[in-house]
């Protein structure tokens, strides 16, 4: 999920975020980041499903045209 980020890099990112935002804001930021990622994944899945449906409909139309000829 994080690509080539290892544990030391993640700890450094967390430490910098802790210094910048403080311990009281960090849970709120994490929650909001989690919601954003969830929404992005949901949107991405919906787009993929829509494209798959559109592709199937196009294939069905092409099949009907071939059968009519």
Swiss-Prot record:
Gene3D superfamilies recorded: 1.20.5.3310
Entry's localization field: Cell membrane
Keyword check for Amino-acid biosynthesis: no
One BP term from GO: protein transport by the Tat complex
Sequence intervals crossing the membrane: 1-21
GO molecular function annotation: protein transmembrane transporter activity
Membrane topology: Single-pass membrane protein
Record's keyword annotation contains Chloroplast: no
Functional summary from the UniProt entry: Part of the twin-arginine translocation (Tat) system that transports large folded proteins containing a characteristic twin-arginine motif in their signal peptide across membranes. TatA could form the protein-conducting channel of the Tat system.
Family statement drawn from the similarity comment of this UniProt entry: Belongs to the TatA/E family.
Protein name, per record: Sec-independent protein translocase protein TatA
Annotated organism of origin: Alkaliphilus metalliredigens (strain QYMF)
Lineage: Bacteria, Bacillati, Bacillota, Clostridia, Peptostreptococcales
